[in-house]
């Protein structure tokens, strides 16, 4: 029988963002729905670990990482107009980024066949040097680099299925032929990227695929 891992942690709820749309209620709703389902007891629990600064720095500038930590320590409320933070957001973001890497460890070790990571803050809008669209660190991009550097998984395919285009993830690998990034998203819509013509650059030309879709299509 295939084993599906489930990575989450109550600490994610301490990334306090109410009344922002990206708030702890999103994870609470997921957890409640899973617990009421017939397959919940068949999930393999995964306890996420915190990502290290070095692991985050595979994708993000060190200065940006330090600024997120400092803004949270200073009890600032926003990193930008869209991205709300609280005192515990930095550590929640480290734990969020670590979930994907923990899941990869278990996948490679044969303990699970696939995994679902219910984490926050989210990540696919986060750019190399800045927060964007509710996102602090690019969780998927960080996990992809970890899979390559630590687990020797040289070729990575990322499928991003979201109403919003994952600009940060795309930009992380736009000139990298070892990571194929595909996105299906509503267009035109936030953040304005993700046109069909965006297919990569340099050695990465042809390794980005965007599938912009009309609303309700």
PLM regions and their residue ranges:
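HDAC/HDAC-like amidohydrolase catalytic core signature
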Residues: 1-217
